[in-house]
Amino acid sequence: MIPSMNVVRQYESIREELDQAALEVLHSGSYILGESVERFQTEFADYCGTKYAIGVGNGTDALVIALRACGVKAGDEVITTAMSFFSTAESIAAVGAIPVFVDCTSDTYLMDTAQIEEKITEKTKAIIPVHLYGQCADMDVICSIAQKYKLKVIEDAAQAAGADYKGKKAGSMGDAGCIS
């Protein structure tokens, strides 16, 4: 097997800082909704250029919460791409909605925006673009289509945290952004 990255080497490069931060949280005894979580949320919102950031258990939970917050419910349709981790579609199904898939492009493996409009029906309530491999989907086109059809945009940026699209961070351009 050819490893794609060396996580031990990555850890070693910031070991002291990570160990100190983890020990601070452990010694505080405050793991949920504590001072460290509040500080992280504030700093991460600043980093992403958003007003808020809310820490939750995992990326799937973040997507489910975002879908519910955007009013997506049973029987609604949500357009996304099949080129993603299964939790993108799983989160749509978890709220009782139906995932509607568009293909990805052969050069970026991101959502093929040319296919979005043909998938929109009266049941469509949202689009979940998936940012992958440190690249952002074409958010100008996606947001324009969403605005035209009055759809919500929920960004799945779990695989592109810190990625940049025309000066904006992944997860900061739609109605909600989910990063894990």
Describe the role of every protein-language-model region.
Residues 19, 23, 41-45, 64, ...:
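Solvent-exposed, non-membrane alpha-helical residues enriched in polar/charged side chains
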